[in-house]
Amino acid sequence: MNKKANPGLKIICLNRKASFNFFFEDLIEAGIVLKGSEIKSIRDGKVNIADSYAVEKDGEIVLINSHIAAFKQASYSNHNPTDERKLLLNKKEINKLIGKMQRDGFTLVPTKMYFKKGKAKIEIAVAKGKKQFDKRATKKNRDWNREKARHIRKSS
């Protein structure tokens, strides 16, 4: 009985750097406006969201600096790999995010991209940047947890 945790979800890309560099306050799922060649590249797994972030532009949330590789089989109508991509959110969600960004100094960082029921989705974290000492503490805790797990395995 090998069942997946979430059968309708196929994760394409993770942003592991985000959890190291930021404190997450809230996670929001958003759709992405894509062209045909972009969706085919995403299905091939040729996506990088490690250095990307989202900003407000003309009352919309836009994903910047995400890299979706050009699709080889697309001829003249291929897309630009580093285009800005509009995120699909409700007006209420957009206003909430804009308020947090302006008032509280939060930033919007993508944490993962996945397919849900055949549609490409992206998980955006409302996050605040970590200082250098916070990053050191995170690394220290991670190393300590690894060491504890090793000791437990040895003693068993």
Swiss-Prot record:
HAMAP family: SmpB. This is SsrA-binding protein. One of its GO terms (molecular function) is RNA binding. Keywords: Cytoplasm, RNA-binding. It is found in: Cytoplasm. The keyword RNA-binding applies. Residues 133-156 are annotated as: Disordered. Transmembrane segments: none annotated. The keyword Transcription regulation does not apply. The gene is smpB. Belongs to the SmpB family. GO terms for cellular component: cytosol.
